[in-house]
């Protein structure tokens, strides 16, 4: 999995699947053994696969589920339908070029629409689900459904199904306010300049590791505890942005997870604040999905 996640670390998966289209994906899921762990993967950010690998099926969305188109407007709003495999920056540019506004922040998200939906990705004041009209999901039987925000518990970097079924996002319909293309493109350029200046984009990383606690910033707390530069093996708390853990070259998933645990324990003991992971960790020495617990 190291080649497929942005941390460039982690063990092997039992099965890889690149669906040709949604029908192909439905047939694949329907044919899986009951209880087979399934991991949907876009660009591989926000994810750590343990060194023992993932004992299940990894489904890649970025090749097949990449359609994007403008739909009939909702009043003055631009409506865009995008597949789960569409990179978030691509969606941001599409919205701008079609006269929409409010998606500029997505230019700084290093993931896909599917990943953004799954965690309510956001930055620079924007959040994914603020723009969602509806989503399309697929379950283990290959059944595709249309759902709305009412079907989910949505919060800061948190999305949970209210109906309890195991489903994955395959696309969404978004609505955006009217905007100006030139202004939107300029705003995206400015955000990207800011991102390059403040984040360690020259080294493998997964994006922000921890959620910001209410009224504070994880990076500030980590830096206050003197943890910038702390390392285990080749995994290091970035000296450029404390809420990033970088792979200096050859880091194992265990190295990265050890840094995460040390940061959480240190911040908790010194400040009383319990940092909650934003990144998902899957697998184990035996390859069993660890889920998304903090």
Regions found by a protein language model. Give the residues of each.
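Short N-terminal helix-initiation segments at or just after the protein's N-terminus
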Residues: 79-81, 108-117, 156, 183-191
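A gly/ser-rich beta-alpha-beta helix-loop segment of oxidoreductase catalytic cores
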Residues: 89-98, 104-133, 139, 205
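Short secondary-structure transition/capping segments
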Residues: 51-53, 115-118, 242-243, 288
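Phosphate/pyrophosphate- and phosphate-bearing ligand-binding catalytic cores of soluble enzymes
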Residues: 3-9, 47, 138-294
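Anion-binding (especially nucleotide phosphate/pyrophosphate-binding) glycine-rich loop
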Residues: 2-113
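Gly/Ser/Thr-rich helix-start
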Residues: 11-12, 43-45, 54-57, 86, ...
């Amino acid at each position: 999995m190291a080649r497929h996640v942005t941390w460039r670390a982690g063990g092997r998966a039992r099965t890889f699947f690149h669906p040709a289209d949604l029908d192909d994906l439905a047939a694949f899921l329907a044919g899986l053994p009951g209880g087979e762990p399934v991991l949907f993967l876009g660009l591989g950010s926000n994810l750590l696969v343990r060194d023992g690998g993932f004992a299940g099926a990894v489904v890649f969305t970025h090749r097949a589920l990449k359609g994007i188109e403008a739909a009939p407007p909702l009043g003055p709003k631009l409506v865009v339908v995008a597949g789960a495999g569409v990179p978030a920056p691509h969606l941001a540019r599409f919205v701008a070029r079609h006269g929409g506004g409010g998606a500029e922040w997505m230019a700084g998200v290093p993931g896909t629409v599917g990943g953004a939906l799954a965690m309510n990705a956001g930055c620079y004041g924007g959040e994914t689900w603020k723009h969602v009209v509806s989503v399309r999901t697929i379950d283990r039987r290959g059944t595709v459904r249309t759902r709305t925000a009412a079907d989910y518990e949505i919060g800061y970097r948190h999305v949970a199904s209210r109906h309890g079924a195991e489903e994955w996002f395959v696309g969404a319909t978004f609505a955006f306010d009217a905007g100006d293309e030139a202004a939107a493109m300029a705003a995206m350029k400015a955000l990207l300049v800011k991102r390059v200046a403040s984040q360690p984009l020259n080294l493998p990383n997964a994006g922000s590791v921890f959620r910001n606690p209410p009224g504070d910033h994880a990076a500030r707390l980590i830096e206050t505890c003197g943890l910038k530069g702390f390392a285990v093996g080749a995994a290091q708390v970035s000296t450029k942005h404390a809420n990033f853990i970088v792979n200096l070259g050859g880091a194992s998933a265990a190295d990265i997870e050890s840094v995460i645990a040390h940061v959480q324990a240190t911040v908790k003991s010194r400040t009383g604040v319990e940092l909650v992971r934003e990144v998902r960790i899957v697998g184990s020495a035996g390859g069993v999905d660890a889920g998304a617990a903090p």
